[in-house]
């Protein structure tokens, strides 16, 4: 994974964990969990591509990897919509910047996962 992407994930997760959004803190914790899960999935998919020939072990380890891939894209779309919603309702500039960066990162990661998945197909 690109070192900028790693630091972006870490930076956004750290910023989000410091936010206090009142009654919606439970939703924010859910977003943080989704971000962490997405990062791990993206890393494992990237490692499989790096090993090239690892498609068969990926398929045998998880026969439903295409289903899992589809689920991850649904999670990304959900996160994108959630981040856009937060961006619309927040007036705090720190939160706006954080959510704008999170949105940009999600779009980049979505593209990377698409690229990896095409290489594995």
Swiss-Prot record:
Localization annotation: Virion; Host nucleus
GO biological process: exit of virus from host cell nucleus through nuclear pore
Motif segment (Nuclear export signal): 12-21, 85-94
Pfam families hit by this protein: Flu_NS2
Keywords recorded for this protein, A-Z: Host nucleus, Host-virus interaction, Transport, Virion
GO CC term, one of those recorded: virion component
HAMAP family: INFV_NEP
Function: Mediates the nuclear export of encapsidated genomic RNAs (ribonucleoproteins, RNPs). Acts as an adapter between viral RNPs complexes and the nuclear export machinery of the cell. Possesses no intrinsic RNA-binding activity, but includes a C-terminal M1-binding domain. This domain is believed to allow recognition of RNPs bound to the protein M1.
Comment field (misc): Average number present in a viral particle is estimated to be 130-200 molecules.
Family: Belongs to the influenza viruses NEP family.
Description of how the protein assembles with itself and partners: Interacts with protein M1. May interact with host nucleoporin RAB/HRB and exportin XPO1/CRM1.
Listed name of the protein: Nuclear export protein
